[in-house]
Design a protein with these regions (language model features):
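Bacterial N-terminal signal peptides that target proteins for export
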Residues: 1-8
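Bacterial N-terminal signal peptides
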Residues: 8-16
Length: 215
């Protein structure tokens, strides 16, 4: 399935190198490089283009199959563990569907935050933290989860906190879910710039990844 999207300005498809807190206060000025975390609360998020495409929406149904998610990640990181990529693709589709989150958005955000599973920053592979939750700088690398499913579920739940005011459908595993204030503050990916991540181009970077996914 292919979506027709409006083009956005090209930005390099690299992991964000700006530390953030996870929904609970201003983002501290720390020295890069570290992977971006999940959502410090900033009073006035930067304005981004307001495309009407549902592809930009955090909530909704993703259009890509697990096979396409797998091929997309491996195209960008041929050295990734293919078995783990297959597992993560299926988990993102399952967990996103359970909460009504757009699985395409969640998956490309994971690719962005982890450098297509290269990691290399404060968050490491064995942490099963696929979105930088709680990663704010040296000495605070972020949250650890016992397995891939729990880590993916925490990511999906944190996205839902930004994209919707609805309650969770599954048991809460994201300890920072209640720290996102106000709930539903970012119905689309552009609202994540300056809130989820310090990077003011964060939403555009995710849009570039979505464009690539849908090619």
């Amino acid at each position: 399935m292919r979506r027709q999207l409006r083009l956005v300005p090209f930005l390099a498809l690299v992991p964000a190198m700006c530390p953030t807190a996870a929904g609970d206060g201003p983002i501290p000025p720390l020295s890069p490089p570290v992977l971006s975390g999940a959502g410090g609360v900033i009073p006035d998020p930067v304005e981004q283009p307001s495309e009407e495409s549902a592809a930009w929406s955090i909530m909704g149904e993703g259009g890509m199959t697990a096979d396409r998610l797998v091929s997309f990640l491996l195209e960008n990181n041929p050295d990734a563990d293919s078995a783990r990529v297959v597992l993560l693709a299926s988990l993102y589709i399952e967990e996103a569907a359970a909460e009504g989150v757009n699985s395409d958005v969640a998956f490309v955000q994971m690719c962005h935050e982890t450098g297509f599973l290269r990691f290399g920053g404060l968050v490491t592979e064995e942490m099963n933290n696929f979105c930088g939750l709680g990663s704010t700088g040296p000495g605070n690398p972020g949250l650890r989860f016992p397995d891939e499913r729990t880590g993916v579920r925490a990511h999906i739940q944190h996205l839902k906190a930004y994209g919707s005011t609805d309650s969770l459908n599954l048991g809460q595993v994201d300890p920072r879910f209640g720290l996102v204030s106000p709930r539903g503050r970012s119905p689309d990916i552009f609202g994540l710039a300056g809130t989820w991540a310090a990077d003011r181009q964060y939403g555009l970077r995710l849009a570039d990844l979505l464009e690539s996914l849908y090619e």
